[in-house]
From Swiss-Prot:
Source organism: Methanocaldococcus jannaschii (strain ATCC 43067 / DSM 2661 / JAL-1 / JCM 10045 / NBRC 100440) (Methanococcus jannaschii)
Listed name of the protein: Uncharacterized protein MJ0359
Length: 214
């Protein structure tokens, strides 16, 4: 029996693009190896990170509400068709392909240094017909850790301490991103009411102002 996962995801964009999305009921995929999860339609699992994306573009509250928007998406996907890089099995597959590409130079046209970006690896995995990832998976899910500088300062002060226990393990802000490879799993798109949550999000950005580079 197939098990399905229902996700509510968030996509930040400018107002004109949001209006086109709502009119056409589709989001055009981002393309290129510079996108860290490869080609696809990008979402955040938490509303705040979608807000953070548009906040980088416009920090004035009124102009932000006027010129930017967040799209809320309902996504339904078979659990087995999610390539989840927070899971050991899928992370190992990625790591093996990463090592293979970097050691054998499979993508000489894309490699410019000794190491390659995640987007090169994931696009290779999903575009290579022999590997068949594009037929097996509809979604790529991954954790993007944002370093929190306040913890880094604490660790720097503790460098000379001899006990290993000084290491802090929650020195990042967790940001889960989802890259939809198969648009058919997107079942519904609607406007997110940013006015109801913007003041709360502004408090969050103020707390993490230094860490987020705002």
């Amino acid at each position: 029996m197939m098990s399905y996962v229902r996700m509510t995801l968030y996509h930040g964009t400018d107002r004109k693009s949001a209006e086109k999305i709502m009119e056409s009921k589709e989001i055009l995929p981002s393309q290129g190896d510079n996108h860290w999860l490869g080609d696809g339609i990008y979402f955040y699992e938490e509303e705040f990170h979608a807000f953070k994306w548009i906040w980088y573009k416009e920090k004035n509250r009124n102009r932000l509400l006027k010129n930017f928007a967040i799209i809320k998406a309902e996504v339904i996907c078979e659990e087995s068709r999610i390539f989840d890089l927070t899971k050991i099995e899928h992370k190992l597959l990625f790591d093996m392909m990463y090592k293979l590409i970097n050691t054998t130079k499979l993508r000489l046209d894309k490699l410019r240094g000794d190491m390659c970006a995640e987007g090169v690896v994931i696009n290779y995995m999903f575009k290579n017909k022999e590997l068949g990832y594009n037929k097996r998976f509809d979604i790529v899910r991954a954790l993007f850790p944002i370093p929190v500088k306040k913890y880094q300062k604490i660790e720097n002060r503790e460098k000379n301490k001899k006990y290993k226990e000084r290491t802090h393990r929650l020195t990042f802000m967790p940001e889960i991103q989802v890259c939809v490879k198969n648009p058919s799993v997107i079942k519904k798109l609607e406007w997110y009411d940013l006015e109801k949550t913007i003041d709360k999000f502004l408090i969050y950005t103020e707390i993490y102002k230094e860490d987020l580079g705002i």
